Every structure is written in C-alpha cells, then in structure tokens.
Amino acid sequence: MNHIQGSLIYEGKAKRVFACENPNRVLIEFKNDATAFNAKKRSEIDGKGRLNCKISAALFKLLELNGIPTHFLELQSETFMIADKINVIPLEVVIRNIATGSLCRETPINQGTILNPPLLDYYYKDDELGDPILTERRLKLLDLISTSQIEKIETITKTVNKILKEYFDDLDLLLVDFKLEFGFNSLGEIVIADEISPDNCRFWDKTNSDPKGRILDKDRFRQDLGGVIDAYGEILKRIERDSSNSS
C-alpha cells in the first residue's frame, strides 16, 4: 500500500523520516550520503540508499519471521520503507563477534580475535558528545530506560546476533559486529528501529583471504578502499539468492 509523503520529521546522516496520513506510521527515505567518524568524513555514493533500504527490509523480515519485533512494515519503493512511528531510545547497542575497529584501537586486543562470548557495548547516541561508551553504572545513572528494559534489549540483541550469525554463515559471510537502535512503538513495546545494513554491520567474505578484499561494509569507505557499491551489492545479491533458493 502506498502512503502519501507528508512533512519532514527528521533528517539524519543517512535517512530522512517523513510523516504520512497514518499518525502512527512514517516513511523512511534512505539517502546516498556516506559518512564516517561522526560525519567528519562525508561523500555521496550513487545507489547506496537503494541497497541499504532493500538489505534492511530483507533482514527486518527475517527477524520478524523469528519473532523479533521491529519497526519495519513494508517497502514503499526501492529507497522508501514504511515503518511504525517510534520514540527512539538514544542508545546505540553494539555487539561484537570478532575484534576490529575501535575495540582494537582502544584496547590491546588483536585484530581478528574471536570474542566468545560476544562483547556487548552501549553508547550514548549524541554526535556532539561523540557517542560516548557507557559503563553499566553510567547507563543506569542516565535513567533512559528501566533495568528490566535494559535486560530486554540485551536479550533481543543477543538473539538477533545468533539469528544473523547463522544466516550469514550460510551465505559465506562472517558477521563481525553490528549496531542496533531501539525505540517504543505506539503500544509502548520495545522494537528494533533504524536499519540493518552494511552501514551499521561489518561483514567479511569467508571466500576471500585478503584482509582488505574480504571487507563488504562501510569500512571500505572509512579506509578509502573503494568498491563500496560493489561490496553492498554483493551482500544484497547473496541475500536475494538465498531468498530465491528458499522459495
């Protein structure tokens, strides 16, 4: 069902959120903008919005089939999705299966170390503050959500990790780490929001042993490796191939 695009509610680094005729729903547009390091590095990559929108839709559907609540409702077009309107919790929840990125910059842990159990970190979502990491006590001090809601988010995140790790393993992809955002829908339920794409997940190609060649996510933009669209397109191609094989 097509929804009429209303006024702009919010514009972030990678998406625009618009009102629609149903007050409990929104239209989310995925932009071609690429940013890194809290938008200190910027570019525009043609086709990126389309790929992220389609990848996110497919992964949200996968999670919904496995009983995980998300804000996703349906695709409106290749770059727009219809979603539940939510009150966003200003937290970024990161779960790491393999050590890389900031974890290796900030600790002596070696790149590529398998993290068992996976490491779960919270960050306060605020660009001006640089999205600082939160200890358990700081998280409670901020009083953003209750202790039981924190526990629910942790449970959902760990379950999502298990589902996606197994799913991508079958696609010859390692799910290195990923970030989730959450919010409350109109019923007061906690649901996954934002997106799930190579913008907020790290994927390594299991069939490629080259440390740079195997990267199929936004690290290609962060590290000036090039081939961003090819990498994102490869993720979508494997997802769609799996979908066609399953149908």
From Swiss-Prot:
Q: Catalytic activity annotated for this protein?
A: 5-amino-1-(5-phospho-D-ribosyl)imidazole-4-carboxylate + L-aspartate + ATP = (2S)-2-[5-amino-1-(5-phospho-beta-D-ribosyl)imidazole-4-carboxamido]succinate + ADP + phosphate + 2 H(+)
GO terms for MF: ATP binding; phosphoribosylaminoimidazolesuccinocarboxamide synthase activity
> Would the keyword ATP-binding be found if you checked this record's keyword annotation?
yes
Q: Which PROSITE patterns match?
A: SAICAR_SYNTHETASE_1, SAICAR_SYNTHETASE_2
Q: Does the keyword Nucleotide-binding apply?
A: yes
**What biological-process GO terms show up in the record?**
'de novo' IMP biosynthetic process; cobalamin biosynthetic process
Ordered alphabetically, the record's keywords are:
ATP-binding, Ligase, Nucleotide-binding, Purine biosynthesis
Please state the Enzyme Commission number of this protein: 6.3.2.6
* Protein family per UniProt: Belongs to the SAICAR synthetase family.
Q: Which NCBIfam families match?
A: purC
| Official protein name in the record | Phosphoribosylaminoimidazole-succinocarboxamide synthase
* Origin species: Prochlorococcus marinus (strain NATL1A)
Which lineage do the record's taxonomy fields give for this organism? Bacteria, Bacillati, Cyanobacteriota, Cyanophyceae, Synechococcales
Instruction: Please state the gene responsible for encoding this protein.
Output: purC
